[in-house]
Swiss-Prot record:
UniProt-annotated catalytic positions: C179
EC number: 1.14.-.-
Enzymatic reactions: uridine(34) in tRNA + AH2 + O2 = 5-hydroxyuridine(34) in tRNA + A + H2O
Keywords, comma-separated and alphabetical: Oxidoreductase, tRNA processing
Short name of one Pfam family: UPF0176_N
Family: Belongs to the TrhO family.
Record has tRNA processing as a keyword: yes
Protein name as it appears in the record: tRNA uridine(34) hydroxylase
Function, in words: Catalyzes oxygen-dependent 5-hydroxyuridine (ho5U) modification at position 34 in tRNAs.
Alphabetical list of InterPro entries matching this protein: Rhodanese-like_dom, Rhodanese-like_dom_sf, TrhO, TRHO_N
Length: 305
């Protein structure tokens, strides 16, 4: 399958007092170059995932890294066979990754970075507690062998999980954390350091860097890695999984899930069928119909029809 679109996942923590002034130039540049995705700007830095042609993404990265505060972003590239986003959004936020705890600053204190090549040895050590900092639906698709699942719906719930599991967290000599691309672990390990935990580690570049770097036969990763775009999830080598999202609840569906009698495109799946009222389902049907009409109009305009 031809990989047409370059996907860039990036973040950089910084003390960015003028972040509001970057919104319009970034949005204009993305629109001019056909780039789609989401970029978040806050006083604490930039975070986002975008996709476009190779040349367009290179133009954007040059623009971002020309900003003195963003000269060395954490940057991860992959490829997609079709555009994985519907539009471009450049948003102003209080945090570039929302934990909801005041005063957490990865620029001041953060866990020790561990390269993918050294990760296996760390998490196989009996004195290491391995913690998956992602949400429950992400964990469901895949995780590292032996990792603890906090069973959280959003990253905001992570501090409360830590508070409720102090005894478990203190049983082992060290804590190793991981997430998709690394940004949540910047916050989570900084938070743990603030609480007094000393030996805190996290996977540099996140799961995506690990899946790209470590050969499948040596990997301790089991399953797929959820990504927040239309690819839904990726496997070793960052190959697309072929999954799709339920548009009603955003549950990741494989081929088997789409064969269920509860599955209706844009309306329901096994995960949400019994939780939705008939009114909700009718509303979702209308939303899906409007989406299909808009999609058809866009295709026709591109074809000059």
């Amino acid at each position: 399958m031809e990989k047409k679109f370059k996907v860039a996942a990036l973040y950089c923590f910084a003390d960015l007092k003028h972040y509001q002034k970057l919104q319009k130039p970034l949005l204009d540049l993305c629109q001019e170059n056909g780039i789609k995705g989401t970029l978040l700007l806050a006083k604490e830095g930039i975070n986002g995932t975008v996709a476009g042609s190779c040349a367009a993404i290179e133009t954007l990265v040059r623009f971002i890294t020309a900003e003195p505060a963003f000269q060395t972003p954490e940057l991860k590239y992959s490829w997609a066979s079709k555009m994985p986003f519907h539009r471009i959004k450049v948003r102003l936020k209080k945090e570039i990754v929302t934990m909801g705890v005041e005063g957490i600053n990865p620029l001041k204190a953060v866990g020790t970075y561990v390269a993918p090549e050294d990760w296996n040895a760390l998490i196989q050590d009996e004195e290491t507690l391995v913690v998956d900092t992602r949400n429950d639906y992400e964990y469901m698709l895949g995780s590292f062998q032996g990792a603890v699942d906090p069973n959280i719906k959003t990253f905001r719930e992570f501090p409360q999980w830590v508070a409720n599991h102090q005894d478990e967290l203190k049983k082992k000599k060290r804590i190793a954390m991981f997430c998709t691309g690394g940004i949540r672990c910047e916050k989570s390990t900084s938070y743990m350091r603030e609480l007094g935990y000393e030996e805190v580690y996290h996977l540099k570049g996140g799961i995506l860097q690990y899946l790209e770097t470590i050969p499948k036969e040596e990997s301790l990763w089991q399953g797929e890695c959820f990504v927040f775009d239309e690819r839904v999830s990726v496997r070793h080598g960052l190959e697309e999984s072929g999954r799709e999202l339920c548009r009603a609840c955003r549950y990741p569906l494989g081929a088997e899930g789409k064969l269920s009698s509860h599955y209706e495109e844009g309306v329901s799946c096994d995960a949400c069928y019994d939780t939705r009222s008939e009114f909700d389902k009718q509303r979702f049907r209308e939303r899906h119909r409007q989406f299909q009409l808009a999609k058809a109009r866009t295709m026709n305009s591109h074809q000059g029809l």
